[in-house]
Curated annotation (Swiss-Prot):
Keywords: Amino-acid biosynthesis, Aromatic amino acid biosynthesis, Lyase, Pyridoxal phosphate, Tryptophan biosynthesis
Keyword Amino-acid biosynthesis: yes
Source organism, top-level taxon: Bacteria
Requisite cofactors: pyridoxal 5'-phosphate
Gene: trpB2
Chemical reaction(s) catalysed: (1S,2R)-1-C-(indol-3-yl)glycerol 3-phosphate + L-serine = D-glyceraldehyde 3-phosphate + L-tryptophan + H2O
Organism: Vibrio parahaemolyticus serotype O3:K6 (strain RIMD 2210633)
Gene Ontology MF terms in the entry: tryptophan synthase activity
PTM annotation (N6-(pyridoxal phosphate)lysine): residues: 94
UniProt-listed NCBIfam families: trpB (TIGR00263)
Role played: The beta subunit is responsible for the synthesis of L-tryptophan from indole and L-serine.
Protein name, UniProt field: Tryptophan synthase beta chain 2
Length: 407
């Protein structure tokens, strides 16, 4: 480790080392300060914490269990465990921060939640939270992802959300963020932009991390109860990086726990626009209101990106991940599309668990660690279930795995 981890991050300006901050138009500066003040007040409010704890237990179904994947473990020679965030209400980790953001918005007197979504999991979770607390909800989603993740689009609409297509650029997650931010600028007084990851201007990277830290806090206790010790390795996929920060946060000071973040290598790391491996190939820059590693084109603008996982195709990453990369605390690797799909089917057929394609990147990396000689324990954050992906996977990859499309 190059430097010791500073647990008191971010600082008051929202910086993790040199990354983070708040780069917003002047008309939003006071709004961001107000959100931060309201959040800090809620952190000290026993009623807020009690309400969130009650909903986590009785609405989400927490704590999510840890499962020993015995069949995969036997096959590959390492003890592979899964933190089952796929079993949460709405099917992923996103509900953890969406409930927090929704309750915060209600306490601030907001009328509407507004957000982007890639795979649709954040959108479904936010629409769910909005329905629960009685707020309107607008979700911006790339036109390509709307077609690809149709089941989640239907869920959002059933829950009462407006799903608004982003039709510019590559029509995926980055464009959805652009469209949501543009809409938010028009009326920041009555809306809360409920950012869907540990990205964006301060206080969102801190706030979303804090809400997601329940994953790691639970996992630390559960793993010790199951095995008598901490895991040798943690593995989680990284797009913006919320599920990963949720797991990693409880183990950052444990130097004997190796931590691995897994980025999407897409079709090729060698071609611009064919991957979204920000920490692997990016450089520091500013986009969407924060400084972090990002993938830039020749003009310094965000690169086009690709991943088979809609929730991972983002040209930047949470600022705390950038900091953890620079100090050497977390190793960031990558998994390509084909490896992720292989892991999608392998976990399904070896353990009876259909994972989200995003989470499949983490499963694939855990398998690769085992194949490379890791014989200790590997705890994978299974961040979501694959219901949303099954039609896309069968249509595009089914023949390779002996499945004919029924459509």
């Amino acid at each position: 480790m190059k430097n010791s981890f500073d647990h008191n991050m971010p600082n008051n300006e929202g910086y993790f080392g040199e990354y983070g901050g708040s780069f917003v138009p002047p008309e939003l500066e006071q709004i961001m300060r107000d959100i931060n003040a309201a959040y800090e007040e809620c952190c000290q409010d026993p009623e807020f914490k009690d309400e969130l704890a009650r909903l986590y237990k009785h609405f989400v179904g927490r704590p999510s269990p840890i499962f020993h994947a015995a069949n995969l473990s036997k096959k590959y020679g390492a003890d592979i465990y899964l933190k089952r965030e796929d079993l949460n209400h709405t099917g992923a980790h996103k509900i953890n921060h969406c409930l927090g953001e929704a309750i915060l918005a209600k306490k601030m007197g907001k009328k509407k939640l507004i957000a982007e979504t890639g795979a649709g999991q954040h959108g479904v979770a936010l629409a769910t939270a909005a329905a629960l607390v009685g707020l309107e909800c607008d979700i911006y989603m790339g036109e390509v992802d709307i077609a690809k993740e149709h089941p989640n689009v239907v869920r959002m609409r059933i829950l009462g959300a407006n799903v608004i297509p982003a039709t510019h650029g590559r029509k995926t997650l980055k464009e959805a963020v652009d469209a949501a931010f543009e809409a938010y600028l028009k009326d920041p007084e009555t809306q809360l932009y409920a950012i869907g990851s540990v990205v964006g201007p301060h206080p969102f990277p801190k706030m979303v991390r804090d809400f997601q830290s329940i994953i790691g806090n639970e996992a630390r206790v559960q793993f010790k109860e199951m095995t008598g010790k901490l895991p040798n390795n943690l593995v989680a996929c990284v797009g913006g990086g919320s599920n990963a920060m949720g797991l990693f946060s409880a183990f950052l000071e444990d130097e004997n726990v190796a931590i691995h973040g897994v980025e999407p290598a897409g079709r090729s790391l060698d071609k611009v626009g064919e991957h979204a491996a920000t920490l692997t190939l990016g450089e520091p820059g500013i986009m969407h209101g924060f400084k972090s590693y990002m993938l830039k084109d020749e003009q310094g603008e965000p690169q086009e990106v690709h991943s088979v996982a809609s929730g991972l195709d983002y040209p930047s990453v949470g600022p705390q991940h950038s900091y953890l990369k620079d100090i050497g605390r977390v190793n960031y690797g990558s998994i390509n599309d084909d490896e992720a799909i292989d892991a999608f089917f392998e976990l399904s057929r070896e353990e009876g668990i259909i994972p989200a394609i995003e989470s499949s990147h983490a499963v694939a990396y855990a398998i690769k660690l085992a194949q490379q000689g890791e014989s200790g324990s590997i705890l994978v954050n299974l961040s979501g279930r694959g219901d949303k992906d099954i039609d896309f996977v069968v249509e595009n990859y089914g023949a390779k795995y002996g499945i004919e499309s029924l459509i």
